[in-house]
Design a protein with these regions (language model features):
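Conserved N-terminal catalytic core of the sugar/cofactor nucleotidyltransferase
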Residues: 2-5, 13-16, 26-27, 31-106, ...
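Conserved donor-nucleotide/metal-binding helix-loop-beta segment in metal-dependent transferases, i.e.
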Residues: 113-141
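Active-site glycine-centered loops adjacent to acidic/histidine catalytic or metal-binding residues
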Residues: 9, 108, 136
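A structural signal for short hydrophobic beta-strand segments in well-ordered beta-sheet cores
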Residues: 25, 146-148
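Short, amphipathic C-terminal "tail helix"
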Residues: 260-261, 266-287
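Catalytic-core segments of class I nucleotidyltransferases/pyrophosphorylases
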Residues: 103, 117, 121-124, 153-252, ...
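Charged/polar low-complexity intrinsically disordered segments, enriched in acidic residues
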Residues: 252-258
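Hydrophobic packing residues within well-ordered alpha-helices of enzyme cores
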Residues: 14, 61-65, 184, 233, ...
Length: 287
């Protein structure tokens, strides 16, 4: 399975912070926001990754992430000049995807919790249909809302309904089979002129091929798209890391523990981080 990180948009809700920098490059406590979505793909075992962003922001992402080989990954890059919908990612990435199944994750979504790596690895084994997650929220009318039966089969999905049929929202991570590009190309723009991810999911739903996996109460899902939620996400990460003494969404550590890089390669990475606490933490992994 291949992975796509969608890190486009103008981040208008975060102005003036995002007037000169991509939202997904802003810090969430001690690391760039993009590290959190990247880490989810890595935990799923996905090593070939396409990052899609604006022409203005791509150079900064390239400088930060490089070709991915330092983490045992392979990065590609593509432009989305204007925000024309999440589902456009599959059209932009058609050549990258080829005939492989694909996971799309939004660059401003942060996940953490018990059992999450196993759920991601299981989802990455998908060969037919599509799989989305369901997360209970108190304000489902703000999200794409999904209804499903006890077997995890989707029954209905709506985008920001006035009267939600459930309190389960669909977070910004989606798994699709190799037919996703063809289906995305058949989508019609919505009233706001975008190719909607909910409409793509509806195509799989209509074919009886949309599965739902619940994220349990032990999983946190944070959307760092506003000043308030960005601060909350940073405070959450700091609290967990200070309490546990372990980092959340550290690509170097994940690459090492997943066997993508060895101890010699990890030690080489620590030299570029100087005397920062981040670098000191990585050195403890080699002790």
């Amino acid at each position: 399975m291949k992975g796509i990180i969608l890190a486009g948009g103008k981040g208008t809700r975060l102005h003036p912070l995002t007037l000169t920098i991509s939202k997904q490059l802003l810090p969430v406590y001690n690391k760039p926001m993009i590290y959190y979505s990247l880490s989810m793909l890595m935990l799923a075992g996905i090593r070939e990754i396409l990052l899609i962003s604006t022409p203005e922001d791509l150079p900064a992402f390239r400088k930060l992430l490089r070709d991915g080989s330092q983490w045992g990954l392979k990065f590609s890059y593509a432009e989305q000049a204007e925000p024309r919908g999440l589902a456009e990612a599959f059209i932009i990435g058609a050549e990258f995807i080829g005939q492989e199944p694909t996971c799309l994750i939004l660059g401003d979504n942060i996940f953490f919790g018990h059992g999450l790596p196993e759920k991601l690895r299981n989802a990455a084994n998908l060969t037919e249909g599509a799989l989305v997650f369901a997360y209970p929220v108190k304000d489902p009318e703000r999200y794409g809302v999904i209804e499903f039966d006890e077997t995890g089969k989707a029954l209905n999905i709506e985008e920001k309904p006035r009267q939600p049929g459930s309190n389960f929202a669909v977070p910004g991570i989606y798994f699709y089979d190799r037919t996703v590009v063809a289906r995305a190309k058949n989508l019609e723009p919505s009233g706001r002129g975008e190719l909607e991810i909910t409409d793509l999911n509806r195509l799989y739903l209509a074919a009886g091929q949309l599965q739902v996996e619940q994220m349990g109460r032990g999983v946190a899902w944070l959307d760092a798209g506003t000043h308030e939620s960005l601060m909350q996400a940073s405070s959450f990460v700091q609290a967990v890391e200070d309490r546990q003494g372990m980092m959340i969404s550290c690509p170097e550590e994940i690459a090492f523990r997943m066997g993508f890089i060895n101890a010699v390669e990890l030690e080489k990475l620590t030299t570029t981080l100087g005397t920062s606490n981040y670098g000191k933490y990585l050195r403890t992994l080699l002790a």
